[in-house]
Amino acid sequence: MLLTRTSAALGLTALAAIAGCKRRESSALTPPAGPPTTATPAGSPTPAAPTSLEATVQARLDSLPAQSSFYARDIRTGREVEVRADQPMNTVSVIKLAVMVLAYRDADAGRLRLSERHRIRPEEMRQGSGVLRMFTPGLEPTYRDLITQMIATSDNTATDILIARLGLPRVNRLLDSLDFRETRLRMTIGNLFRGVWVQLDSANARLTDRQVYDRGFPDDSTGTGLYLRYVTDSTRWFGRSTAREIGLFLEQLELGRLASEASTEEMRRALLNQVWDTRLPQRIGERVSVGHKTGDWEPQIGNDVGIVFAPGGPIVMAAFTNANTGPMWKLNAALGKVAEDVLNAWSTTR
């Protein structure tokens, strides 16, 4: 999550969340003009005929008034399901996974002490998802705590503290070194939220992070489409990736190829502690454990990616929905059914 319903409750009716949604809630934003774009880009290879499972998954996604993509891979057998899996998407908070991995790699290398405490200053507070902004400045969480909050509650304050500590360019160098060419962290949360104000007046580029925090978000309840234009402009995305790349990134994490065994276990635990369970785990969460990371700007964006710990072995799933014009509950329900479709199909054919 980046933006939450707490913001809407404060009169910021145009925003919601860059993380996910366990509290089956949604907010309303002005729908984008025109239908979602789902066509295969010119020059792309003709996709193979879909399997029955792929056809089912695609039908569910295509029923949504949104740009969508999906990728699933059974780590044990290597079988895959993909629907527009190579289409670049606005990740919103899903990209925080890369920040987490770099933090643990730095810990493994001795560059970061996870037990070290960081005193949160007023200028480090960020609006949107998370709980740290609700506390009085001066709180001193450990870096391990900050990572946990960045993933489990998609805390934006924790995210920017970690980006400042690790270095944004280093996140992208890590992704480059792992051959994830479409996956990028584009900016800080502070710059992302400042950009909303810059749309209204270029002079707002001079606002400090604390001034942006104190202002909150502009009211778009009159339906001007302010937030729609913002989140669909690819130059202003917080993060960028494809369903395939994020799925393979999660596979590498689960296989222990991104960090030490101890760090891998801590990252797995952080994903399992995710508090927003209304998408991928919605219909399968009582059957299997799902370690996942959501990403939202409701109701226009609702993403969920994760590792499904099925009895026969782990399955990675990545679902992106951008430019959604329908209610969030329908989007959440569709992704929940897609996850159930994949789990059911592969559980009976192992």
Predicted regions and their residues:
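Structured C-terminal helix/loop/strand segments within mature extracytoplasmic catalytic/sensor domains
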Residues: 22-58, 167, 231, 235-350
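Active-site-proximal loop and beta-strand segments within enzyme catalytic domains
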Residues: 105-148
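C-terminal motif of bacterial Sec signal peptides marking the signal peptidase cleavage site
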Residues: 17-20
